[in-house]
């Protein structure tokens, strides 16, 4: 239910240029004929979209008449929807400015709550990120402590990253088959920071960027905030369609392409070598910068770990390939250390841009990362074996409690991309929370409205017993009366 919020002054005015079209919004909403009363059903769905970030805050909503036409309902119904949103704090209106989205007092956007985790006893399957064994962290801190004495007398600013860490990351690339110099490495505060720096330097508002669909939501949000136009290429149950990738690069000529070829998030798929080669060649012909997200590349569970994407380029052909990596998925997200590999000249420009925002990363975190990378030969095999056990436990629990769901066991990564067989994922995610499980609807990973409502991303990063309990709770939630969303059956809005 949409609960009424205490009266308060109208929220901040809508952001100029940030609007939600009637057809775009209709593609995200359920069929108003699917429940009674329709206005309350639509208001609940709309508040959920605002809360989880699929509709931006302070964005202008369509006029009542336009939305009524797009949904095939009466204007009276939409008027009641907007009234209920205003009463509950999810919208505000002003003469001449229309109606725009907001959050009630005390509510946190789910983009933030996904990261900080549940503040209750719910099982958290919204974050595909493992924890770090306590003793591993304690031992690493013990080793790092004496090294801090060397750095304490210095200012501590390293916009390029600690020289030793840059060298270690470069050596890691070289060992994996891509000769790399320390000058080609920029240490960042995580992979997301690396992507944001690249976008800020190479792109301008309105530029086109090729992305996979589905893709990593935080990357899509970074592109949206930079006012870039995404052009999506599908990742289906059969993997990537290289012909669509080639034709998109040839016809659209995007400024940048963001790809996750190694145990793709959320599907877990691994791009074959021949498709990597063809992608590199097509990007070289179009002059497109390739940004390759390798944060999951080490998490190979059933196959050998893949070599770097850029290693498949022709000699001298890696000039427009940027590779992003991180400690978050292999070690711990609390260690805010990532990196990018790029031509040395570009690294210099990126470091210059970085100084305007954060001056450089934490010396302590970088020393910890250096210590953990040196121990990766011992730590990583244990991590992989743990993930294999947990993946098997999740698959067995799904087969037992939800046999109607289907999935493909990924060769690596951190999650299953589960097909529910009907577009109820968002409704199930809401109902599962009532049963004590936080889970992500596939729609959160979509580049276009109305897609992947039949999918859930279920990580296997928590203990096996917890996964089994979570699946049992989801099965109980599934037995409830879920309203089937009709968005997948409507033509989705296209920019």
Where do the protein language model's features map onto the residues?
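N-terminal basic, amphipathic alpha-helical segments
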Residues: 1-146, 351, 355-361, 406, ...
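Hydrophobic residues in well-ordered beta-strands that form the structural core
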Residues: 211, 232, 292, 439-441
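Conserved glycine-rich beta-strand-loop-beta hairpin in the small C-terminal domain of fold type I
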Residues: 387-395, 405-419
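Short hydrophobic/aromatic beta-strand micro-patches
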Residues: 341, 417-421, 459-461
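Structural signature of PLP-dependent enzymes
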Residues: 153, 350-357, 372-395
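Active-site PLP attachment segment
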Residues: 96, 312-349, 361-364
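Conserved core of the PLP fold type I
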Residues: 152-287, 298-316, 481-495
């Amino acid at each position: 239910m949409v609960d009424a919020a205490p009266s308060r002054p109208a929220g901040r005015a809508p952001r100029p240029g940030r609007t939600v079209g009637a057809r775009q919004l209709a593609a995200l909403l359920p069929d108003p004929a699917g429940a009674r009363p329709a206005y309350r059903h639509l208001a609940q769905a709309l508040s959920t979209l605002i809360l989880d970030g699929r509709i931006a805050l302070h964005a202008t909503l369509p006029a009542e008449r336009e939305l009524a036409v797009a949904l095939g309902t009466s204007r009276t119904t939409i008027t009641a929807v907007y009234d209920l949103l205003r009463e509950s704090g999810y919208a505000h209106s002003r003469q001449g400015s229309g109606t725009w989205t907001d959050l009630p007092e005390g509510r946190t956007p789910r983009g933030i709550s996904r990261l900080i985790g549940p503040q209750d006893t719910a099982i958290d399957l919204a974050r595909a990120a493992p924890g770090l064994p306590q003793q591993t962290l304690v031992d690493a801190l013990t080793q790092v402590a004496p090294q801090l004495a060397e750095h304490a007398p210095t200012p501590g600013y390293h916009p390029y990253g600690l020289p030793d860490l840059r060298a270690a990351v470069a050596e890691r690339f070289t060992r994996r088959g891509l000769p790399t110099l320390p000058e080609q490495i920029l240490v960042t505060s995580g992979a997301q920071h690396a992507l944001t720096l690249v976008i800020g330097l190479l792109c301008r508002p309105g530029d086109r960027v090729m992305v996979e669909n589905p893709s990593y939501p935080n990357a899509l949000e970074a592109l949206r905030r930079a006012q870039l136009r995404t052009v999506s290429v599908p990742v289906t149950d059969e993997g990537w369609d290289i012909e669509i990738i080639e034709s998109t690069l040839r016809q659209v000529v995007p400024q940048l392409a963001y790809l996750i070829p190694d145990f793709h998030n959320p599907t877990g798929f691994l791009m074959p070598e021949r498709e990597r080669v063809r992608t590199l060649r097509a990007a070289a012909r179009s002059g497109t910068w390739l940004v390759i997200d390798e944060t999951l590349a080490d998490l190979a569970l059933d196959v050998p770990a893949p070599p770097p994407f850029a290693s498949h380029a022709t000699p001298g052909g890696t000039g427009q390939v940027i590779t992003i990596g991180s400690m978050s998925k292999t070690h711990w997200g609390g260690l805010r250390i990532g990196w990018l590999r790029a031509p040395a000249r570009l690294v210099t420009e990126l470091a210059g841009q970085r100084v305007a925002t954060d001056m450089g990363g934490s010396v302590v975190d970088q020393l910890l990362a250096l210590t953990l990378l040196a121990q990766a030969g011992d730590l990583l095999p244990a991590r992989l074996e743990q993930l294999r056990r947990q993946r098997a436990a999740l698959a067995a629990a799904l087969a037992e409690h939800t046999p109607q769901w289907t999935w493909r066991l990924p060769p690596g990564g951190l999650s299953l991309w589960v097909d529910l067989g009907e577009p109820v994922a968002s409704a199930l995610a809401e109902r599962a929370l009532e049963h004590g499980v936080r889970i992500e609807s596939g729609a959160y990973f979509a580049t276009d409205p109305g897609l992947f409502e039949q999918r859930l991303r279920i990580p296997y990063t928590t203990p096996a017993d917890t996964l089994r309990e979570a699946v049992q709770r989801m099965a109980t939630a599934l037995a409830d009366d879920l309203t089937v969303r009709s968005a997948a059956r409507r033509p989705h809005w296209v920019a």
